[in-house]
């Protein structure tokens, strides 16, 4: 601790000598700004010129405008610089801040504060303990994610298997029902009696008794020549007989009429 204070005291004395140098007083404003550029603050931050910074307050010295700790260690949070000073030392912190760019000094100061707090909390591992814990947490989350993905795939596979089994059951049920319908139709066809014969065709209406039905016309057959000759001869003979031999009925009637006329008185 005493060595660090001595080193910081030497640095402070060097700054005082530079400020007391006459050449420093005769420089232009641009040169002064060039010297102060080493302690420039990020945009939106002003130098602490009212109260001493946490570093100067802890080291019990006057805080100059060019103090490298003033923009990054507020006097309202002295515990931050106390942790950094206890772990790294004031001179080492000032060197670290001056080695980085002006736009990154704020992040460097916050990183030093974080590392110092973790080192004080865990002297063995420090930041490595937090990094290992975060790595284990990431691994556990990855394993949980893998488990969830496996469950999702398993549920999807079960759903696909269920849909396939339902389709197979539906197809088998349809096939069984069609086969049973065919068997039932075959059994009913075997057990049922044969169908009745078709009804007979309707007969023509029967004629009255006074009008006997004409006999069916026999098929017309041509007579043979001998029959034609005999029939013609018989017809000729019958005609001859009728010419020379009048029928007896007519002659009898004629004789009766003559006998009855014998009684008629002529010329009365």
Swiss-Prot record:
Pfam families: LOB. GO terms for biological process: lateral root formation; positive regulation of DNA-templated transcription. InterPro entries: LOB. Residues 250-268 have a biased composition (Polar residues). Residues 191-268 are annotated as: Disordered. Residues 223-243 have a biased composition (Low complexity). Belongs to the LOB domain-containing protein family. Residues 192-205, 212-222 have a biased composition (Pro residues). One of its GO terms (cellular component) is nucleus. Expressed in shoots and roots and at low levels in flowers, but not in leaves or inflorescence stems. It comes from the Eukaryota. This is LOB domain-containing protein 13. Residues 51-152 form the LOB domain. PROSITE patterns: LOB.
């Amino acid at each position: 601790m005493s060595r660090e204070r001595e080193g910081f005291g030497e640095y402070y004395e060097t700054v005082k000598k530079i400020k007391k140098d006459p050449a420093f007083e005769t420089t232009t404003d641009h040169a002064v700004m060039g010297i102060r550029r080493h302690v420039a603050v990020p945009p939106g931050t002003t130098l602490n010129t009212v109260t001493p910074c946490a570093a100067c307050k802890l080291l019990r010295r006057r805080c100059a405008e060019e103090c490298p700790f003033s923009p990054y260690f507020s006097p309202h949070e002295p515990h931050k610089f106390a942790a950094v000073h206890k772990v790294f030392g004031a001179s080492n912190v000032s060197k670290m801040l001056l080695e980085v760019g002006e736009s990154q000094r704020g992040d460097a100061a916050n990183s030093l504060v974080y590392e110092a707090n973790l080192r004080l909390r865990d002297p063995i591992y420090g930041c490595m303990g937090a990094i290992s814990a975060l790595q284990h947490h990431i691994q556990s989350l990855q394993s949980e994610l893998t488990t969830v993905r496996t469950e999702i795939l398993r549920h999807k596979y079960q759903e696909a298997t269920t849909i396939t089994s339902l389709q197979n059951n539906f197809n088998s049920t349809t096939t069984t029902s069609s086969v049973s319908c065919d068997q039932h139709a075959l059994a009913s066809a075997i057990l049922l009696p044969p169908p009745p014969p078709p009804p007979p065709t309707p007969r023509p209406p029967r004629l009255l008794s006074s009008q006997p039905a004409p006999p069916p016309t026999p098929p017309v057959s041509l007579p043979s020549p001998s029959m034609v000759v005999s029939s013609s001869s018989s017809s000729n003979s019958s005609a001859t007989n009728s010419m020379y031999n009048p029928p007896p009925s007519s002659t009898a009637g004629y004789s009766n009429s003559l006998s009855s006329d014998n009684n008629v008185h002529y010329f009365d």
